[in-house]
């Protein structure tokens, strides 16, 4: 059975207190993704989820105050971004003319990167029934933030 992923975007109306909670959560998530990205860059571009989770999970929880699912999602988000960059580099090889005038190509790998992938916008990848859920017959959205669960 294949996995099916659906992405939704919604606009929710929140109180000023909830807005602060969401901004804190998305900013901490962004910083956690940058932390994971720096680790991947410094450690030979290891993109295996299990090894990254083993090495970074407790640091993500402690340094950024992320709940368990958000810590794991930050690792998955960063791995996905590096895999996208890897594919883009592969599709655009380095081309040059050799001494005979023939075009040669060298496949680019992640080692061609000069700096780690950087996450500039606050974001959060939420997992249904873990980070968020619909309650009250689907009329209310309950979202996990850094400190507490809030309903909108």
Report residues per predicted region:
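Nucleic-acid substrate recognition interfaces
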Residues: 1-152
């Amino acid at each position: 059975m294949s996995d099916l992923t659906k992405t939704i975007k919604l606009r929710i109306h929140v109180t000023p207190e909830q807005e602060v909670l969401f901004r804190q959560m998305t900013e901490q998530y962004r910083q956690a993704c940058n932390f994971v990205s720096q680790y991947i860059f410094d450690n030979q571009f290891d993109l295996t989820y299990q090894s990254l989770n083993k090495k970074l999970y407790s640091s993500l929880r402690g340094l950024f105050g992320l709940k368990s699912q958000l810590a794991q999602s930050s690792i998955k988000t960063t791995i996905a971004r590096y895999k996208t960059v890897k594919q883009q580099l592969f599709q655009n090889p380095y081309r040059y003319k050799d001494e005979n005038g023939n075009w040669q190509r060298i496949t680019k790998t992640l080692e061609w990167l000069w700096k780690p992938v950087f996450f500039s916008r606050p974001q959060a990848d939420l997992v249904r029934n873990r980070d968020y859920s619909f309650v009250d017959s689907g009329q209310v959205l309950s979202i996990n933030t850094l400190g507490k669960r809030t309903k909108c």
